[in-house]
Amino acid sequence: MFLAATTGLVLAAGSALAADEDDRTAYVRTDLVSNLQNLVQPKDPDLQNAWGVANAPGGPLWVSDNNDGLSTLYDGNGVKQGLTVTIPLPAGQSTPPTATPTGMVWNPTGGFPITVGTATAPAIFIFDTEDGTIAAWNPTVDPIVKGRSTATRVVDNSNKGAVYKGLAFGTNKHGNFLFATNFAAGIVEVYDNKFAAKTLDGNFSDPDIPAGFAPFGIANIDNNLYVTYAKQNAQKNDVIPGAGLGFVKVFTTDGVLIKRFASRGRLNAPWGVARATQNFGQFSSSILIGNFGEQGDFAGWINAFSGGNDNDFLGSLRDANGKPIAIDGLWSIVFGTFLNSDADTLYFTAGPNQQQNGLFGKIVAQPRTETEAMK
């Protein structure tokens, strides 16, 4: 499917990156759910190119299924919950094809109203799509019938060629906002709590970003927005993967550049961003950056950075044999705050096999034995 800045860390791709060779932690990956029968049991055919995720605290984890226009729900054990939500296509379009949801947020406020007929209610979950739309859901206006519901389209920029790849929620002195990465236009779009487009004090710009790179993923960490950049293809609707093809910048929720966080090196079309908990092995409390890039060196790796003022590269998540964990088509990385999840476990979604399939899994930290450390 298709600026008072501090100098960030530029990662070399060679032997200088051996900071993680002496790993103290083995990271163990477990796949929980997939649409592939031979990968995980039980199989879920709806989980196709599992992309963005969101949840209310303690509620199920909602997953955007990019290949079939759905959002499906799971607990921390991978057990599917009894609701499936369809994401609508742009106005005037009909299936097939289906919509292509990407980013998603949970709305903790009473804003972002959805109106259907005479009924109005605040959005609970909000999605953006590669179709150039934003959709929102609340069962008051989007009724559930036999375990299924359909979200309501609230923004439609499909006729402008918008291609949204990520979505974040944030607050600043002006109020509550949505931040959508428009990969085709190379910008971060901003919407207020009535889904109206807005311009903030900053414009999410950094003159150091080379031409041909565009905002890809976006995550709110400690009320700062981490924006990842990937290289555009000729059509500007998808990424060109490859070692060193990526940047990460940090902005305020006003769109003002704070710092250049990471550049090139082990980045390969980075999308997912998460802050590790204090109990995640040697990379506790670090900022984790996940590579979506499906080809080239570092494809599907998860890299750790100090997250302080120095943005030091700390290493990559590795298994008990010291091999980097590589997840084909890696998208979201989040720690457990949802139903039956563990707070110190890293959960992930992915679209393996060129985004044709879907995967939801988890990674836990375990101390490495002395024998393992010598391998």
Predicted regions and their residues:
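Bacterial N-terminal signal peptides
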Residues: F2-A12
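Sequence/structural signature of beta-propeller domains
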Residues: L17-K375
